[in-house]
């Protein structure tokens, strides 16, 4: 297995430890909150949460910011723009846009694990305009066209 090294910069507000994989087969690394004061996300509201890190991804890599399943299932806290995308040329602080879909206010404390980051390769494409597209069994069916039940 090839391990790609990615530069990470700890910013002045950094707290805790760098993101790391929890198990040998984890796809994502937990991101932690680096807010100076507790941030309350009221029910139905959105807050931008700092992480205290900036990264330099290699060309043709991206980082996706995804919800943590436990926060979502137990508290209704999820990533509003899931998945959020960090492009390879972005050098600013990684921040997480959290939304509270629950019924109760939720407080984000410094050091709390708030989201996960998955880093992956991607391909760039170029468009080739065409008047026709190859036929498939699915065709233009979408938005529930295959039904709800198996």
From Swiss-Prot:
It catalyses: dUTP + H2O = dUMP + diphosphate + H(+). Pfam families: dUTPase. It comes from the Bacteria. Pathway: Pyrimidine metabolism; dUMP biosynthesis; dUMP from dCTP (dUTP route): step 2/2. GO terms for molecular function: dUTP diphosphatase activity; magnesium ion binding. The keyword Metal-binding applies. Substrate binds at residues 68-70, 81, 85-87, 95. Its EC number is 3.6.1.23. One of its GO terms (biological process) is dUMP biosynthetic process. It is an enzyme of class 3 (hydrolase). InterPro entries: dUTPase (IPR008181), dUTPase-like (IPR029054), dUTPase-like_sf (IPR036157), dUTPase_trimeric (IPR033704). Its cofactor is Mg(2+). Keywords: Hydrolase, Magnesium, Metal-binding, Nucleotide metabolism. Belongs to the dUTPase family. This enzyme is involved in nucleotide metabolism: it produces dUMP, the immediate precursor of thymidine nucleotides and it decreases the intracellular concentration of dUTP so that uracil cannot be incorporated into DNA. This is Deoxyuridine 5'-triphosphate nucleotidohydrolase. The lineage of its organism: Bacteria, Pseudomonadati, Pseudomonadota, Alphaproteobacteria, Rickettsiales.
